[in-house]
């Protein structure tokens, strides 16, 4: 069985990679961009939609503000990118926001940021994969109703790809990510060329008239209009998700790590901002519209409740290239695919952050080490399990999942900005020349502006989305935070109990050692255990057997006499046939009789040749060992006997057994 599992593992994941080959797994910028930017770039596929959907609540005229909302979002993106460029240079170890906040604001605030990021990474996978699954069912209507199994299957696929290693994942995802960027770039260029030539057609949705919702009849005027603009702005800020992943993945970059990570950040920010603003500008000039509540839609004065609005990119591709054209199909297909690949950013960020938290004793140790392929395999699988659970619980509904999104990342953004402000304040207290001080002041100004912007977005998101599902995210962050505190407390307690404070006392040997061998009969495994115990020369040795009736007692006594062993036999009665409790009681009584002495218990255990044979045996040795391990002052020794190892070879006795005389 084990060989079959190992073979399957090698087929799916690949052969192990030596630790010294880690340098060859590091990412150049051309691979780092698709790995870490797919999340942020894919947000261009739905951030403009969210802006238009929100503004549409105030009617068609309100959509003219969409470009300006996009510009403000791009400004926030620029400030965040500039801030994170400073972070990757100041803290290049891969801790990202967690390290920044822990160092400058304290461990509790750092743990809060880490909890928010972990939750956000899981949500990123759930939202992106669910969106991709729903997009696939739109292209292939026959798959409708199967969104959950499709989404879970896609998560499993991404898990296997990432388990093969970071570099292989980058190679696998580079082509579709670049194809997406090229497709959007071609659409934008052709769109602007047609705009300047005066032959850019209007979108089909431009013919409709969207009436304002009852709560926004005054349009964008008054406090209601300001609040709606803030909602549109906060919805568009989904475009910022994924920016923080690069700061967590600096160790995966080729040298110089910080410089390459900073350049990748600039590339990401520039591409994402230009794509989003260009799409909103083209949407404005084509008259493109989107609305969630179709009861607000009218055509020539008559209601159109059954109208369907395609996503913004699909509408633009249809308008610019023509509905059903090859370029329309290409843009639509790669956009759907990039939504799936967006989850890959989390598959790189989550395991790296989990490894750092594990190093600091906030998460289980299993998340710290790299796997066979030099990826953090346990972290990858933990992320896959968490995301799959959310997909199943929320039925792969993007509408329900999106309400949970963004909160975690903006908690991280805001506290990271505050941490960097504290970082620059510390630098300003050190002696510096004029140019260095001016540079620090400029850097601090960037973070102050970033703190104000991200804090504002966080407040708006919490106010506008709390009752719609953001409360679940807040609860999850609090739960993860509490669990990590409990894990740290456990590890601190264990460290305190294991720490040697008096070396003289711990060097001392036990005064005397007593031993007993637990047997059910005097078989070959039992005789080996007895021989092992005798070889250790304890001051006292006895054979202990539990008997439940007179027949068993006669049988073991007969074997003992026939063996001629110079070791006393002790029979313990068990009229109720409960072997485990009887053995535990007997061992405890021996310990109480001689508490200053060490008691060694030997248990023979035979090992079967095939995994399925274990089902046929009662595994008494394992049950006894688990119980005896918890008795203070008792040392347990398992003496194994592999079935078939004493078979004669070429008519001669095997010489591999040290217990057999030659």
Features from the language model and the residues they span:
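C-terminal membrane-solvent junction of multi-pass transporters and transport-like membrane proteins
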Residues: 366-377, 413-466, 504-506
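Loop-to-transmembrane helix boundary motifs in multi-pass membrane proteins
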Residues: 28, 107-110, 145-152, 252-274, ...
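Helix-loop-helix junctions that connect adjacent transmembrane segments
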Residues: 178, 185-241, 299, 464, ...
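TM-loop-TM module centered on a large, flexible mid-protein loop between adjacent transmembrane helices
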Residues: 106, 267-270, 274-341, 367-392
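Cytosolic C-terminal regulatory domains/tails of membrane transporters and channels
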Residues: 1-21, 492-662
């Amino acid at each position: 069985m084990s060989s079959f599992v190992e073979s399957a593992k090698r087929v799916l994941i690949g052969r192990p990679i030596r630790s010294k080959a880690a340098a060859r797994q590091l990412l150049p910028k051309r691979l780092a961009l698709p790995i870490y930017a797919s999340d942020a770039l894919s947000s261009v596929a739905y951030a403009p939609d969210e802006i238009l959907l929100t503004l549409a609540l105030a009617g068609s005229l309100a959509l003219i503000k969409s470009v300006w909302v996009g510009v403000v979002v791009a400004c926030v993106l620029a400030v965040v990118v500039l801030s994170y460029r400073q972070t990757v240079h100041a803290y290049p170890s891969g801790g990202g926001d967690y390290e920044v906040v822990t160092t400058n604001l304290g461990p509790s605030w750092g743990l809060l940021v880490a909890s928010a990021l972990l939750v956000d990474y899981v949500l990123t996978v759930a939202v992106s994969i669910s969106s991709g699954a729903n997009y696939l069912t739109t292209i292939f209507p026959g798959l409708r109703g199967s969104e959950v199994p499709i989404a879970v299957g896609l998560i499993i696929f991404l898990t296997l790809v990432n388990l093969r290693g970071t570099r292989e994942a980058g190679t696998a995802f580079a082509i579709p990510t670049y194809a997406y960027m090229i497709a959007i770039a071609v659409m934008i260029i052709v769109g602007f060329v047609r705009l300047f030539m005066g032959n850019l057609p209007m979108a089909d949705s431009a013919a409709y008239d969207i009436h304002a919702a009852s709560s926004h009849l005054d349009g964008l005027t008054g406090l209601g209009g300001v609040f709606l603009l803030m909602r549109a702005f906060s919805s568009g800020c989904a475009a910022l998700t994924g920016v923080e992943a690069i700061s967590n993945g600096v160790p995966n970059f080729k040298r110089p790590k910080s410089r390459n990570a900073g350049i990748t950040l600039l590339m990401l920010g520039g591409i994402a901002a230009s794509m989003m603003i260009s799409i909103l500008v083209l949407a404005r000039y084509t008259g493109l519209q989107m609305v969630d509540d179709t009861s607000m839609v009218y055509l020539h004065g008559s209601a159109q409740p059954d109208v369907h609005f395609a996503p913004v990119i699909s509408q633009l591709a249809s308008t610019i290239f023509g509905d059903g054209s090859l370029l329309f199909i290409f843009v639509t297909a790669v956009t759907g695919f990039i939504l799936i690949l967006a989850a890959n950013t989390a598959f790189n960020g989550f395991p790296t952050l989990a490894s750092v938290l594990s190093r600091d004793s906030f998460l289980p140790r299993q998340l710290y080490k790299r796997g066979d392929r030099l990826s953090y395999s346990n972290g990858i699988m933990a992320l896959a399990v968490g995301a799959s659970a959310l997909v199943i619980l929320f039925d792969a509904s993007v509408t329900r999942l999106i309400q949970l999104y963004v909160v975690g990342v903006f908690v991280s953004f805001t506290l990271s900005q505050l941490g960097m402000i504290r970082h620059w304040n510390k630098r300003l207290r050190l002696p510096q020349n004029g140019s260095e001080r001016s540079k620090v002041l400029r850097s601090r100004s960037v973070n102050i502006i970033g703190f104000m912007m991200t804090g504002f977005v966080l407040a708006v998101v919490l106010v506008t989305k709390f009752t719609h599902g953001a409360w679940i995210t807040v609860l999850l962050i609090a739960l993860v935070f509490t669990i990590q505190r409990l894990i740290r407390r456990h590890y601190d307690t264990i460290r305190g109990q294991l720490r040697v404070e008096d070396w003289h006392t711990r060097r001392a040997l036990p005064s005397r050692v007593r031993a007993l061998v637990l047997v059910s009969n005097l078989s070959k495994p039992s005789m080996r255990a007895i021989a092992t115990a005798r070889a250790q020369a304890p001051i006292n040795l006895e054979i202990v057997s539990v008997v439940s009736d007179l027949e068993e007692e006669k049988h073991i006594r007969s074997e003992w006499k026939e063996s001629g062993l110079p070791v006393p036999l002790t029979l313990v009665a068990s009229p109720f046939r409960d072997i485990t409790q009887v053995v535990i009681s007997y061992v405890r009584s021996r310990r109480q009789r001689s508490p200053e002495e060490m008691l060694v218990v030997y248990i023979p255990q035979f090992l079967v040749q095939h995994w399925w044979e274990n089902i046929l045996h009662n595994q008494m040795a394992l049950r006894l060992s688990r119980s005896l391990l918890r008795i203070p002052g008792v040392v347990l020794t398992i003496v194994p006997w592999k079935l078939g190892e004493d078979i004669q070879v070429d008519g001669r006795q095997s010489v591999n057994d040290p217990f057999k005389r030659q």
